[in-house]
């Protein structure tokens, strides 16, 4: 057995001493799809479970069904939080005027009203702890965390709202069958239809 020739090995970029920036995220060649920037480090996404795909589609469709004309529901788009942080929420609700066209690759945190993360096994700590903290610090007013639960592995949605005084998220509800909330707009999503996706 022989080693792979050097010219066929993938050459990963060497990180700068102070970490990567948002400029790097958008200019480094050949990054894998859905690469995120967290605290100046590039984070590559592992293959996802079917649950992840189905939950994103169920929730995105539900959010779109009642979205007001001044807002848009987008999936898997980078959100610039600061110079060293550009995560990619699974779903975001953004101001419609922030959508500039089909070549757009990012949104600014100030344009995001809701960030949704569907927990994945490889990113559970980031989805539960790191990202919510960073979204709140960047001023995103609403956050949903979605996980599998029960014997049938159905989605459970934890809904959080950012307190202006604290700048942190507080849990406002946990939804097993239906998500029914009035912020950031009137939303009703039937989680029991999950198996249709």
Pin down the residues of each PLM region.
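Gly/Pro/Ser/Thr-rich low-complexity, intrinsically disordered segments predominantly at protein N-termini
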Residues: 1-197
């Amino acid at each position: 057995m022989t080693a792979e020739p050097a010219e066929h090995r993938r050459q990963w970029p060497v990180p700068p001493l102070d970490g990567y920036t948002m400029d790097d995220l958008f200019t480094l060649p050949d990054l894998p799809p859905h690469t995120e920037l967290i605290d100046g480090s590039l984070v590559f996404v592992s293959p996802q479970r079917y649950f992840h795909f189905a939950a994103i589609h169920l929730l995105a469709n539900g959010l779109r069904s009642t979205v007001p004309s001044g807002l848009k529901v987008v999936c898997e788009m980078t959100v610039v939080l600061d110079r060293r942080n550009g995560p990619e929420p699974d779903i975001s609700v953004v101001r419609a005027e922030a959508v500039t066209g089909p070549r757009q690759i990012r949104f600014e945190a100030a344009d995001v009203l809701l960030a949704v993360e569907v927990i994945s096994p490889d990113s559970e700590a980031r989805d539960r702890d790191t990202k919510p903290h960073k979204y709140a610090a960047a001023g995103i007013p609403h956050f949903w965390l979605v996980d599998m639960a029960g014997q049938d592995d159905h989605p459970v949605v934890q809904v959080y709202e950012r307190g202006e005084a604290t700048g942190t998220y507080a849990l406002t509800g946990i939804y097993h069958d239906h998500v029914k909330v009035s912020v950031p707009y009137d939303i009703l999503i039937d989680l029991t239809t999950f198996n249709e996706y």
